[in-house]
UniProtKB/Swiss-Prot annotation:
Family: Belongs to the bacterial ribosomal protein bL21 family.
Pfam families: Ribosomal_L21p
Keywords: Ribonucleoprotein, Ribosomal protein, RNA-binding, rRNA-binding
Assembly behavior: Part of the 50S ribosomal subunit. Contacts protein L20.
Keyword rRNA-binding: yes
Protein name: Large ribosomal subunit protein bL21
Family matches, as NCBIfam families: L21 (TIGR00061)
PROSITE patterns found in the cross-reference section: RIBOSOMAL_L21 (PS01169)
GO BP terms, alphabetized: translation
GO terms, molecular function: rRNA binding; structural constituent of ribosome
GO CC term, one of those recorded: ribosome
Length: 104
């Protein structure tokens, strides 16, 4: 069984046991979160349930494995011949989750 869920403005195709990195969730490590924005559920018998826009009564349960920050991305702007240089770094926060159960 698999599902397509929406979290952090992005869509993820998930199955039970998958580990993925999503945009930061406000949850503690080793706690469980419920993702109830489910767009699609594919069952083992080949049946697919598509939501309009969400599947009614479907939710995905996941365990929070870690909270962290991604590698630094360096943004460097400059204007030639004008002595203008600007260096900026950004580290995007993320949450590492493991999918435990898909309820549909």
């Amino acid at each position: 069984m698999y599902a397509v869920v929406v979290t952090g403005g992005k869509q993820y195709k998930v199955a039970e046991g998958d580990v993925l990195f999503v945009e930061k969730l406000t949850a503690d490590v080793d706690s469980t979160v419920e993702l109830d924005n489910v767009l699609l559920v594919g069952k083992d018998n080949g049946e697919t349930v598509v939501g309009k826009p969400m599947v009614e009564g479907a939710k995905v349960t996941a365990k929070v494995l870690a909270q962290g920050k991604a590698k630094k991305v360096v943004v460097f702007k400059y204007k030639p011949k004008k002595d203008y240089r600007k260096k900026q770094g950004h580290r995007q926060p993320y949450t590492k989750i493991q999918i435990e159960k898909i309820n549909a």
